Amino acid sequence: MRAVVQRVSEAKVVVGEETVGAIKKGLLVFVGVGKNDTEEDCEWLADKVSGLRIFEDEDGKMNLSVKDINGEVLVVSQFTLYGDCRRGKRPSFTEAAPPDKGKALYEKFVELLRKKGLKVETGKFRAHMHVHLVNDGPVTILLDSSKLF
């Protein structure tokens, strides 16, 4: 699984005219599921995201997690994180999970974050979404359960 994690002061997802998920201070997490991913990848990613210390403590050091600050998490599915642009100009998505598997593991990831006590909002799987955010920092972290980066 891959994730782009952004520290935000607020974020929301709109589908059509409806806001389907919105948070205040916390993390916006774009999640992509790979074709070889398993529930172990979900567990690794949920553990990493929930404990990622990218919020500043009283000394100005990045030392606090989203849990530590009682922040919120907005999770948005994004299969394009598996886009491969090494050949040509058009991305190939052959490494992305098929929709049924992608949805199941995406939902498992969200469930695991909630079990860790986090307030989690979501986008809408397979929908065309407009994501609005105020990036705080900016702080953007890339995660990959295969530890490619």
UniProtKB/Swiss-Prot annotation:
GO BP terms in the entry: D-amino acid catabolic process; tRNA metabolic process
Protein localization: Cytoplasm
Biological role stated in the UniProt entry: An aminoacyl-tRNA editing enzyme that deacylates mischarged D-aminoacyl-tRNAs. Also deacylates mischarged glycyl-tRNA(Ala), protecting cells against glycine mischarging by AlaRS. Acts via tRNA-based rather than protein-based catalysis; rejects L-amino acids rather than detecting D-amino acids in the active site. By recycling D-aminoacyl-tRNA to D-amino acids and free tRNA molecules, this enzyme counteracts the toxicity associated with the formation of D-aminoacyl-tRNA entities in vivo and helps enforce protein L-homochirality.
Entry's EC annotation: 3.1.1.96
PANTHER family named in the record: D-AMINOACYL-TRNA DEACYLASE 1, D-TYROSYL-TRNA TYR DEACYLASE
Record key words, sorted: Cytoplasm, Hydrolase, RNA-binding, tRNA-binding
Gene Ontology CC: cytoplasm
Description of how the protein assembles with itself and partners: Homodimer.
Protein name: D-aminoacyl-tRNA deacylase
Matching Pfam families: Tyr_Deacylase
Family: Belongs to the DTD family.
Single GO molecular function: tRNA binding
Domain text: A Gly-cisPro motif from one monomer fits into the active site of the other monomer to allow specific chiral rejection of L-amino acids.
The reaction(s) this protein catalyses: glycyl-tRNA(Ala) + H2O = tRNA(Ala) + glycine + H(+); a D-aminoacyl-tRNA + H2O = a tRNA + a D-alpha-amino acid + H(+)
InterPro entries named among the record's database cross-references: Daa-tRNA_deacyls_DTD (IPR003732), DTD-like_sf (IPR023509)
Motif segment (Gly-cisPro motif, important for rejection of L-amino acids): 137-138
